């Protein structure tokens, strides 16, 4: 049984090398690039990846395209800023060699913020269904955070691996804010597409406050120190921004209709 690693990327030269080096042992690496202007594609080719170029259609469709171009019996889906540790690699190899293995496996994830593992506040173990038999996984859910699920026609039983992958998405505050700006915009567009039109004091002020209080105090985010404080504070800002952008989108559409 072989393993394909599926990755989508754009301008990820700062992290893609470490990610690809961690899975060089895989039988195949498929990287779909959506127009990088840095060295992402060059680094990927140097690491032995098969690089495919495709304009960005959205995360679900781009990941699906990567899956479709995998040729091995098993697929491991990774983000461009995730690393497979040696212990996790050994566990994955054990799964794909097992003839009685299930159709999919959840992998815990260590999320790093400013270089620190955030163990509390709901950020760990953060399990993701990332390892699955080829042809049996499908992207589902709305942008900006769609997920992998098993296709309904297959056995839905899944397993859980013990060793976490490492997710180093936010090495700086600037990188975190840039990601959250993108996510809040995508989340707002998805909400408006579903018909959400609300604008309220609750959404803009109270919902972010409640999010901070719940994650920082009740889910023990304060145990992550200063990094935990900043993470949950700016996550609350993200929530407020998303609902403000929903209002902005609906206001713009209303103005356009009114002027037509």
Model-predicted regions and their roles:
Residues 7-28:
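Short, well-formed alpha-helical segments that are part of the catalytic scaffolds
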Residues 34, 54, 72, 79-82, ...:
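Short acidic donor-binding/metal-coordinating loop in glycosyltransferase active sites
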Residues 2-4:
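Cell-envelope/extracellular polymer assembly enzymes that use nucleotide-activated donors
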Residues 25, 70-73:
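Active-site acidic short loop of glycosyltransferases
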Residues 64-67, 74, 85-253, 260:
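Catalytic-site signature of metal-activated, phosphate-bearing donor transferases
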Residues 14-17, 38-47, 87-88:
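Acidic helix N-cap motif at the loop->helix transition within catalytic regions
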Residues 22, 33-42, 79:
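A conserved acidic beta->alpha catalytic loop
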Residues 54-70:
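Glycine-rich, basic loop-to-helix element that forms the pyrophosphate-binding segment
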């Amino acid at each position: 049984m072989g393993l394909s690693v599926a990755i989508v990327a754009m301008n990820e030269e700062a992290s893609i090398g470490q990610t690809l080096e961690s899975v060089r042992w895989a039988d195949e690496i498929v990287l779909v690039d959506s127009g990088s202007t840095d060295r992402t594609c060059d680094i990927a080719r140097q690491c032995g990846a098969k690089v495919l170029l495709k304009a960005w259609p959205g995360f679900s469709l781009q990941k699906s395209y990567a899956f479709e171009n995998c040729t091995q019996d098993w697929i491991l889906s990774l983000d461009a800023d995730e690393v497979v540790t040696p212990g996790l690699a050994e566990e994955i190899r054990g799964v794909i060699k097992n003839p009685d293995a299930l159709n999919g496996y959840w992998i815990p994830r260590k999320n790093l913020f400013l270089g620190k593992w955030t163990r509390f506040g709901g950020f760990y173990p953060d399990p993701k269904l990332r390892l699955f038999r080829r042809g049996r996984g499908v992207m589902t859910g709305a942008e900006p955070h769609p997920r992998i699920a098993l296709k309904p026609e297959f056995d839905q039983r899944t397993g859980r691996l013990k060793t976490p992958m490492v997710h180093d998405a936010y090495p700086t505050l600037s990188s975190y804010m840039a990601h959250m700006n993108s996510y809040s915009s995508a989340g707002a567009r998805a909400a408006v597409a579903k018909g959400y039109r609300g604008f309220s004091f609750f959404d803009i002020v109270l919902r972010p406050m409640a999010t901070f209080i719940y994650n920082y105090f009740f889910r023990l985010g304060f145990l992550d120190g200063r990094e935990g404080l900043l993470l949950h504070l700016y996550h609350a800002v993200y929530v407020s921004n998303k609902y403000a952008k929903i209002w902005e989108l609906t206001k713009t559409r209303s103005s356009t209709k009114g002027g037509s």
